[in-house]
Amino acid sequence: MLYYKYRKIINDLTWIIPNGNLRREVRNIFKKLLETADKIDCFVDKINRIDYIENKDNFVILKVAGGFTDQILTYVVGKYIEIKYNRIVKYDLGWYKFHGMDDYNLNKRNFDLLNVFPNLDFNIATEEEAILYRTLFYFKTSIGEEFHNLLNTRKKLYLAVRPNELECYYSLKNDFNKIFDFDKNLSMKLSGGGNKKTYDKIISSECPVAIHIRVGDLLKDLKKLDRNYFFKASEIISKKLYPKKPTFFIFSNDMNYVRKNIINSKFKSYDIEFVEENDNDSGFMDWYLMFKCRHVISSVGRFAVTVYAFIDYEDKILITPENIDKI
């Protein structure tokens, strides 16, 4: 891509502009010009090949990136497009080949969706299709008016869709709950180790509550999320569930930090279980164990909120940094 090839030169040239807003505007103009040049080069090269045969099919290609939650949500959007718009949907997995790291460049993200759900109707775009569509028909959008307008007016689309994907899930909830049969596909992976013991504790608990603490979120946004947030959320749920007694199952990507800084002496009156069996390569097992809980306390990320959406319990409770003062 020409823009990324010349990005440093563009930044150096525009840096001499003293006004920040004008500097950004000029930089965006350069970016648009180079993106347009990319599209023209790609299109001309494509149709000028001797072996070129015009493809009459019009696809919607979705960019797949991120961890297990993002993969589920992208598939939800794809299936929604197939059902609601009668479009052919393909998925671009190139991100896992060329980047494949989390937001903090600490942990590798694996494409686990088809390992967990091997029977999904999942049409993977070829590398050539992905490059062509990404170069010529790319739109970054969220679920909303622009999203629906694009699907109604464009024959060929390459979409990077975030956020609001759960709107697609809720509109076809019964269909997606059948597609994603977590018990059928993940209960067999419990084996006889720590995950099976945790599973047994969860299903035998009177009120199992999952607390998801992604440490990166804590360090990134301390104003919204600190150790007091999780204690306050635990107090709220305990009062709502009284006289039943909750058991709190702690899930985190850095349990040492959690033990030292968050789940401290304030929690001594609560029944606490630390779930430490799974590493970065088996995050889908944390997903399943949280899915078996009835209630969820979420950090800033999408993981816990998405798990909560799939939990089949009528009186389930979700606490997030956004709603904690409204519950």
Where does each model-flagged region fall?
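Boundary detector for helix-to-coil junctions that initiate low-complexity/charged tails
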Residues: 1-43
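N-terminal pre-catalytic "stem/leader" segment of glycosyltransferase-like enzymes
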Residues: 46-94, 98
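Secretory-pathway luminal glycosyltransferase catalytic domains
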Residues: 46-52, 57-58, 99-245
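Conserved aromatic-histidine-acidic binding/catalytic patches
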Residues: 62-70, 221-225, 246, 281
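Short, flexible loop/turn elements at secondary-structure junctions
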Residues: 66-67, 95, 163, 215-217, ...
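Short beta-strand segments
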Residues: 91-93, 212-213, 247-252
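Short, charged/polar "capping" segments at the starts of alpha-helices
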Residues: 97-101, 219, 254-261, 325-327
